[in-house]
Amino acid sequence: MIEVVDLLYKNPHDIVRTPDQEASMKHLLLEEVINGATVNPQLQRDIYDLISVPEPDPENIMWRRDILDDFLSNPALFDDLRSILGIYDEICKGMRNATRGGGSAVVSKKELTGRDSQIFKMRSYADCIVRTIEMYEEAAKVFKPRRLMSEAFCRIKDFVNRELRKDETVKLKKLAAELAESITLDTSFIISMDLNKYFCVEDVEMLELDSNPYNYKDPKKREGFDPKARIEYIGFDSIDDGQLRLLVEKSIARLCRQMEHIVNELKRPFEKISRGIYFYRFGIGLENKIRELGLPVCLPSVDAEDKRCFECSSACDLWLAMNMKKNDRYCVPGDSIVANDIYLGPTDGSLVITGKNNAGKTVFLRTIGIIQVLAQAGLPVPAETCYISPVHGLYAYFTAMDTGNGRFEDEVKSISSMLDIVSEGDLVLLNEAFQSTAYEEAADVLCNVLAYAAASGFRCVSVTHLPGIKEHMRELEGEFRLPFRAKFAEAAVDSEGKPTHKIDFLRG
């Protein structure tokens, strides 16, 4: 059995989408971020479909991250691998042509049709076998000089070399090459037993032959018939015995099926590679885009043991940088965007951010959301360092101030829908929620959400103008002995009271 390595999943699983998750990605402007990193419409759709649902398995995240690291550390690797996949595409095209050129070779002993078609198929399949083994040889050349660290590429490199070292592979290529080069529509014999023996699918139906290939006996009537007997070839002339012609036609058809099977098996690993390569095309482009914007960039680190961790140094809002570049193509957003350090440890509860308008609170919140999405996909993030814990659910609600409409009742309904499905370790982002009603009522609702988060084990990061939240939360934490204490931060201002766009974490 040939090993198949999936470039996207070390541990494949089903993806579950929810309406709340989809709505959250719209609030985070994820689609705009993806579209800002690539102009390819199909790639935009494929990436959004993949990363809009957070990948919960840490092994899958690091699987992708390490593969991408290999691509980034070996700049020519991606193009070389694309060239190999070009051979794979040619093989697939050859298989399709062979299938379209084929037909039923056997209709009856009285009437034979499709011989030319079957010979064409046999020659096409033989050529595909040769090309497939050549694809393995090219892959070995690509991988040999490179220092690849990811488990995925190490496994691919090993199985490619393992297959090429087999004597059977060398013999198979030689036989298939002879068949592909020699057979024509006028061919009067075919090699059969060697290929049949190698494939070990089932014995081709053979008649007992002597030195004259047209003297034969019916094997069903011959005593002591050995179906495993080695026969190099069988032959026929177009004007000769119809029964022998039928035998050869059936042998060709069976041989075609065997060759089709072996090509499909040999190319199967490269089919998986072909299906997953798009992700790394985007990842390489995203890293280049972040650098082009003048932002810091790194690959994320993920620890399966730690939960509720979000640690970034010099984190930036990628959407803001892309939007600035869109409005002024000559600007370098990294020169003016203020980076923030973010630390939320395993024992920290929810985070509440307060401060003046237009002081960077919403930017800070969106930075957390976008970095969590990208990091959890194994993609580069706009930060100097990044260490996260994966979440099963990432939910976001940005109200009228930033994204559209939102009355108090609608806000309560939308956020309640999220809270109905949120689970331990999840992340909920709220921007200016519950601002459309009286301060006291809104503050009570928000504090209840934060208390519920502490009791349930998920984290809520909330931007708010509501007064008295810290005092109210300390009362609830003491009264109900909540296992996590909320943290508080505020948008900093300078000595003149102007926003610095830095977010300062408060003590106490």
Question: PLM features: what roles do these ranges have?
Answer:
Residues M1, V5, N161-R165, E181-T184, ...:
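Generic preference for hydrophobic/aromatic residues in regular secondary structure cores
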Residues E311-G508:
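ATPase nucleotide-binding head domains, primarily ABC-like/P-loop NTPase cores
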